[in-house]
């Protein structure tokens, strides 16, 4: 089992028995890639010009829990659904649905999301196709845009995130995928590691000193033994 999934489950076990009126978390915000995307990729792909092919908008995706496709790259739920259920929160909708009710949080994750902005890969000819603009910085921008609506829904900005849990899914795996697919050697890929890590870490440095809330950050899984590599 993926170590990051194990750690996430251990985190949930610490709050076993917490009721829906818990003092712990009253909202959940998630950023990440396909592991926790609940429909943003499908929405972005449909809006893209030309449209981006989508394969997970039909069965068997969604069949084991929802009974129909939901935009999740899973036949059922994803890890953030279980986290929401643990705290008595509703399953988050994709943020790009622009729901009028954001009082319980939002899911900003998009399949294929990168740590480094996508124009870096396009500008340096590291990909042969147009990428969706879904990087970590873009998702953080969406979060910033949503903040006034969330704070209004929770009666004021001062401390409005104090009972929010932020789940940051894996970032970086798609960056490495693009580099390997571009024919980069192991040494060349390794040379990009500091840049990728810096893009993942940098946004949180300022936030952690300005706002009080809890972050749960997921690392990337080992890729060396996976079939594409």
What are these regions (language model features)?
Residues 2-229:
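Conserved active-site regions of diverse hydrolases
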């Amino acid at each position: 089992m993926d170590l990051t999934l194990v750690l996430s489950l251990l985190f949930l076990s610490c709050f076993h028995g917490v009721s829906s009126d818990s003092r712990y978390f009253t909202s959940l915000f998630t950023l990440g890639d396909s592991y926790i995307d609940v429909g943003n990729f499908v929405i972005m792909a449909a809006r893209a010009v030309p449209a981006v092919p989508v394969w997970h908008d039909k069965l068997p995706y969604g069949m084991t829990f929802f009974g129909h496709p939901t935009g999740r790259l899973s036949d059922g739920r994803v890890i953030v659904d279980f986290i929401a259920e643990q705290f008595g929160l509703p399953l988050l909708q994709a943020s790009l649905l622009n729901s009028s009710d954001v009082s319980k949080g939002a899911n900003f994750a998009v399949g294929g999301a990168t740590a480094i902005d996508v124009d870096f890969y396009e500008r340096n000819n590291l990909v042969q196709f147009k990428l969706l603009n879904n990087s970590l910085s873009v998702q953080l921008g969406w979060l910033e845009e949503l903040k006034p609506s969330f704070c209004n829904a929770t009666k004021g900005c001062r401390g409005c995130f104090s009972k929010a849990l932020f789940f940051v899914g894996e970032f970086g795996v798609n960056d490495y995928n693009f580099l390997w697919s571009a024919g980069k050697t192991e040494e060349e890929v390794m040379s990009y590691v500091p840049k990728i890590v810096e893009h993942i870490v940098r946004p949180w440095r300022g936030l952690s000193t300005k706002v009080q809330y809890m972050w749960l950050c997921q690392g990337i899984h080992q890729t060396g033994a996976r079939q594409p590599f």
